[in-house]
Each structure stands twice: as structure tokens, then as C-alpha cells.
Amino acid sequence: MSDGTLVFPTQFIVSTRVPNAGIMYSKDGGKNWKMHNYARTNTTEAQVAEVEPGVLMLNMRDNRGGSRAVAITKDLGKTWTEHESSRKALPESVCMASLISVKAKDNVLGKDLLIFSNPNTTKGRYNTTIKISLDGGVTWSPEHQLLLDEGNNWGYSCLSMIDKETIGILYESSVAHLSLIHI
């Protein structure tokens, strides 16, 4: 986080054998870790991004299918609120995704960005797509989307900013076990 707090997304199973996604954090460089409440039940494979100073977004695979679940915490997971885009804005068939937050000073657009990748479909794992949101994840406009791979694949991906102009994505593609692309 911008204040130096280390944060990782988590998933765990409770006695009901239902998975839950949340976060764990350390304020002392990783010596001690804390975890509070889960964000949403029956979710896994989450990604966490700081969308404003002290505000974390958890973007989760929702095992109910159809779309991503998204929640916000302002207190390191003690309380969560459902984000307005949750279960609406990001179609998905139940798969892992990638999400990164890129600050205005770190990209050539000079705007705060959320960059997201997943199979952009509600059935199967194809149409691997990168999307950019300019409004904190509320909208993901078609003009800010890039279809990388129409073919069937495993669908997992990992995003990174290579430099101020280049997004890197490592993903399970239809033409190779793993493909690395710089955009």
C-alpha cells in the first residue's frame, strides 16, 4: 500500500467447507501478519489493489459463476462493502483473473488506472481480454479493452507494468501453455 503496508489476497475454507476470499496484511515488513473478515462467501482466487490511499479493492472469482465479485475495505478487511461493479461489470465463467492498480505518475496517460485480465465470457475459457478502467473499476469501456486470444485455453493470467508505456501479461493461451505479451 502507499503507506508501506504489505497486503496479500487470501482464500480459506471454514467448517461449512465453503471457500472465502479476504486479505492478510503486515505493517512491520512481514514479521507479523493479521487477517480479519472475508469479503464474500463462496469466492476464491482474489486479486487486491489499492484504489485510493488506504482503500483496497478485492476482485474475486465467484464460484456462483457469471461474473466477478468485487468488494472494498477501508479498514484492512475488518469491514467490507460491495463495490457497485460487483457481479455486473466483469463477465466470467468461474476462473482466476489478474488486477493491478497503476498510479498516474507511473503511466504515460497520467491517469490512475485499474488494469484487469480474464476470459471475457460467462461460459468456457476463451476470449482472454485486457481491460482498463479510468474510474476506479466502476466501468470497463469497450474502447479500453483488447482481445488477446479468442481460442479455448485455461484462462489464468498475470499482469504487470513493464514501464510507463508497456503492460506485460503472462497467460495460459490457446497456442501455448504460457504466452508472454508486451502491449
Regions found by a protein language model. Give the residues of each.
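Short, solvent-exposed loop/turn segments at conserved positions within beta-propeller repeat blades
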Residues: 14-19, 63-66, 122-126
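Aromatic- and glycine-enriched pocket-lining scaffold segments that form the walls
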Residues: 1-25, 29, 33
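Conserved blade-ending motifs and adjacent loop-strand segments that build the rim/top face
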Residues: 88-94, 140-162
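Asp-box/BNR beta-propeller loop motif
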Residues: 24-35, 71-82, 87-89, 123, ...
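Recurrent small/Gly-Pro-centered beta-turn motifs in extracellular repeat architectures
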Residues: 10-12, 59-62, 117-122, 170-173
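Conserved small/polar residues in nucleotide/adenosyl-binding loops
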Residues: 181-183
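Entry beta-strands of beta-propeller and related beta-repeat scaffolds
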Residues: 3-8, 54-57, 108-116, 165-169
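Loop/turn-rich, solvent-exposed surfaces of beta-rich toroidal or solenoidal domains
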Residues: 89-136
